[in-house]
Amino acid sequence: MRRVTDSRADEVALNRALWAVVNERFTDAAADELWARPDAVWGLFEVPERELGVFGEVAGLDVLELASGSAYVSAWLARMGARPVAADLSGEQLATARRLQRRLGPVFPLVQCDGERLPLADGCVDLVVSEHGAAAWCDPQRWLPEVARLLRPGGRLVFLTNSHLSALTVPPEEGVAGEALLRGYAEAYRVRWPGGGVEFHPSHGDWVRLLRVSGFVVEALHELFAPPDRADHPFYEIVSPQWASRWPAEELWVARRA
């Protein structure tokens, strides 16, 4: 059985504790509206999937939502005809997902596990999706090879994460991204926040290299801006809509397993 290093195990435990708090303060209450949405959206400012088209035709596909949180993306995909499995580190967030499955449906498997070590068989899925999950909270040198193991040949990986530029300009203590660079280019690769939690924000070059060595071919990178008239996010202090109207708030990557 593979083991994680003590330092990484400590980071995973720290992230698990952080997301228990976040679920209590925000994600549990927010999940009802997200599960009930008729159409899929992406990111802090809810960019419609119909404008991006990154899912493609998912009916009949086996899908893994990695670091799923309350699994609302899996709910959207299930309604589109996919067969999702949602996996997350946080038992609290998966409890929220179960509550919404009972209240709204649909029902699909929920798995509590580390996104860097998944208890699933090789070649078991056609599509892996992660919306602000694995890309920020898991070590890319661990989770990308794991996803490659799970995907069938030609399967796709679609993941959303904070933009590298936002990671360079978010203050270390509190507040949203500004116009000054507060970290060196490589310093954002691994960020340990004072309030708890360890995030990963590789540069574009890092992502391309990491994806290639894990057996992926990059198909697209969508840089997401805030649409006009968007309000501040009700909970996450990352970027303001004013900032995100000028610079990309998030990056949506699409890659295919070779």
Each model region followed by its residue ranges:
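A short acidic, Gly/Pro-enriched loop at the edge of an enzyme's catalytic core
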Residues: 116-127
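Conserved class I S-adenosyl-L-methionine
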Residues: 156-189
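Short alpha-helix
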Residues: 198-221
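A short SAM/SAH-binding and catalytic strip from SAM-dependent methyltransferases
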Residues: 127-141
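Conserved alpha-helix/loop element of class I SAM-dependent methyltransferases that forms part
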Residues: 32-61
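Class I SAM-dependent methyltransferase SAM/SAH-binding core
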Residues: 62-117
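A short glycine-rich, Lys/Arg-flanked "PGG" loop and its adjoining helix->strand segment in the class I
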Residues: 141-156
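N-terminal, positively charged/glycine-rich alpha-helical extensions of SAM-dependent methyltransferases
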Residues: 1-33
